[in-house]
Amino acid sequence: MARIGGVNVPVNKRVVVALTYIYGIGPSLASKICEGCGIGEDVLVSSLSDEDVVKIRNFIRSGCVVEADLRKEVAMNIKFLMDIGCYRGLRHRKKLPVRGQRTHTNARTRKGGTRLAVAVKKG
């Protein structure tokens, strides 16, 4: 396994696919990284030289927010919305869908499972 961006990427896959294992890098950004480093998209990770891996690491380090930094940034954005008390922040705080989805019949994942009432025998 090659270590790029703090993540072990699989060796037996193409570079474009392997880069998508890094949080924050999707298919389009992965192809831009390959193009910027001068590496073909159909090259396997196992056939990359050490210089190519260093090029990819430096490209990601210089121009991309990935992994822990990106997770922290997203969490801080959500916390900011909750702190200012805007509608989206209130929806996050109540653990309801944020982007206008209906909640009467759907949104089970976001709201949590249904609660079952337990019958108590009178005795």
Swiss-Prot record:
Keyword rRNA-binding in annotation: yes
Gene Ontology molecular function, alphabetical: rRNA binding; structural constituent of ribosome; tRNA binding
Gene3D superfamilies documented for this protein: 1.10.8.50, 30s ribosomal protein s13, domain 2
Coiled coil: none
Entries under NCBIfam families matching the protein: uS13_bact
The protein's assembly and partners: Part of the 30S ribosomal subunit. Forms a loose heterodimer with protein S19. Forms two bridges to the 50S subunit in the 70S ribosome.
Official protein name in the record: Small ribosomal subunit protein uS13
Organism: Anaplasma marginale (strain Florida)
Species classification: Bacteria, Pseudomonadati, Pseudomonadota, Alphaproteobacteria, Rickettsiales
